[in-house]
Amino acid sequence: MIQVYINGQYWGHYNLREKINKYFIAQYEGVTDEKDIDSIDILARTGTDRFTQNGSNEDWLELADFCKKNDLNDPENLQYVTDRLDVDSLFTHAAYEIILGNVDFTNVRVYRVPGGKWKYLLFDVEACWRNLDKTPLEYYIKPVTAKIQGFRHE
């Protein structure tokens, strides 16, 4: 968070961060070929809205469909998913969201470089630590939140 003053006049506070786009991801992942940079898939979800920021969402939709239709307790099915999704990225993302107590957890970004796995990006964490009267994990495992998150809830 940065406090901005211009000519002595307060203009508010701003978040200093890089723009999440194909160039940011290319630099982070070491992608240098322009064709590969243009082929980076970046998907976004804000609340219930989903959109493709760059590239295509076809592979992601196929993966999501596979997860819905198949038993992931089957080792072959689970392997299919882990071949396409960087599970460490998912777990790290979930851990950060929970530890930071982010109540705006439905604003999500995932990306994939050509030939790579889908990875989660930590994004939009301005709503962290707003519910200091509750532990973050308490918030995430309550039934309503679990349903919103898309976790299996019975």
Locate each region found by the language model.
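Catalytic-core segments of enzymes that bind and process phosphorylated/nucleotide-bearing substrates
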Residues: M1-E154
